[in-house]
A protein has these predicted regions:
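Internal, hydrophobic cores of structured domains that mediate oligomerization or house catalytic pockets
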Residues: 60-158
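N-terminal intrinsically disordered, low-complexity regulatory tails that precede a folded domain
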Residues: 1-99
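Acidic-enriched, low-complexity/disordered segments with a strong bias for Aspartate over Glutamate
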Residues: 23, 27, 45, 49, ...
Length: 260
């Protein structure tokens, strides 16, 4: 699961909480996805200019009361982390990710897309949208961690109950064996240890879903394929909730003065 929104949320919040400076935060984001800039700004009242670098945009938003970044990881039928209106929700669902940005007097949304130019330039373009002034309905960290564990158990049982002939099935089964030994955390400094742990676990299980999906129907009966698909769907939903909860777990109530 390669996400452009997660690094912006993690490092943006680390900057807002005073744990890193603006330059360090933007550098960390761009190490993941290449140069980041604001794409075409719709013809509405939004505090962005088309084509400006991410660093410039964030500096301007700071002067407008920027106070939080929130991660959205929606899919069709599950608008996780979104608050509307329709235009923002549709764009984020199609991208399967987005960011809510809290300003002093409003909330705006950012939806990423690949910015490819020529044969070698690859970066990220952020399209801004108006967002409804509401809090997204997302789980807390403890709730999301527990749901992830339960979904893992269900998915492991579903895998064991089918005769999978896919060549990478052993890799999937090994990763379904437990939640220990996750990869590097996608979070930045300032997040609590539990959030880092949950993000690591969710990142590894996102890989399980990616490995298992291509073989969901090969060599299986209709019932087996349905069982496997449902287990993976629930695991994917739990992974997305865990990532959203982990990225929202930083304390922004006692901010230092972020570096410029």
């Amino acid at each position: 699961m390669h996400l452009s929104s997660a690094p912006l949320v993690a490092w943006g919040n680390a900057w807002l909480s005073g744990h890193v400076g603006l330059d360090e935060a933007v550098d960390a984001v761009e190490r993941r996805g290449g140069p980041n800039l604001i794409g075409t700004v719709p013809a509405v009242d939004l505090p962005f200019d088309s084509g400006v670098p991410l660093r410039t945009a964030l500096s301007r938003l700071r002067g407008l009361g920027l106070s939080a970044f929130r991660l959205a990881l929606p899919t069709w039928g599950d608008p996780l982390g979104l608050v509307g209106p329709k235009e923002l929700n549709q764009a984020a669902v199609e991208a399967r990710e987005g960011v809510l940005v809290r300003l002093a007097d409003r909330q705006v949304g950012l939806v990423p897309s690949a910015d490819r130019r020529g044969s070698s330039y690859v970066g990220v373009s952020w399209t801004p949208y108006p967002a409804n002034d509401a809090l997204p309905q997302v789980p807390g960290l403890a709730e999301a961690e527990q749901a992830l564990k339960l979904a893992l158990i269900e998915a492991a049982r579903a895998m064991e109950g089918v005769d999978d002939v896919a060549p990478f099935a052993p890799d999937v089964h090994r990763q379904l064996g437990g939640l220990d030994g996750g990869g590097p955390s996608s979070l930045a400094r300032g997040y609590p240890p539990r959030a880092h742990r949950v993000a690591e676990q969710a990142g590894r299980l996102a890989r399980v879903v990616e490995l298992a999906e291509p073989s969901s129907g090969r060599g299986l009966t209709a019932h087996q394929a349905t069982t496997r698909s449902e287990g993976l769907r629930r695991l994917d939903a739990a992974v997305r909730r865990a990532l959203v909860a982990a990225h929202g777990a930083i304390d922004l109530s006692d901010r230092g003065v972020p570096g410029r």
